[in-house]
Amino acid sequence: MKDLKELRDQIDVIDRQIVDLYQERMEIAAGVAEYKINTGKKVFDKEREDSKLATLTALGKTDFNKHGIRELFEQIMSMSRKRQYQLLTAHGMYENRILQKWKV
């Protein structure tokens, strides 16, 4: 049996990898926002997110892991949308869409 320190060290390594991957994902989300700025596409694509969540959840080996994977990616996708909205707002796009919706 491994000792507790060794197990925690392994978790620490994985946690740093997760942080690096999260930051890389947010950089890519900024690129997605740039694409959407240039094409006028909406940030939220329910069909895409639902499909992605189903695919990722299916990768879980147990029901517990499937549930956790779904929660994890729902949060990651939410943060990705927030980042995209942030960039759209910085470019004046989000306010323009709201104004157009309400015809102000």
Model-derived segments and spans:
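Domain-level signature for soluble enzymes in the chorismate/prephenate branch of the shikimate pathway
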Residues: M1-V104
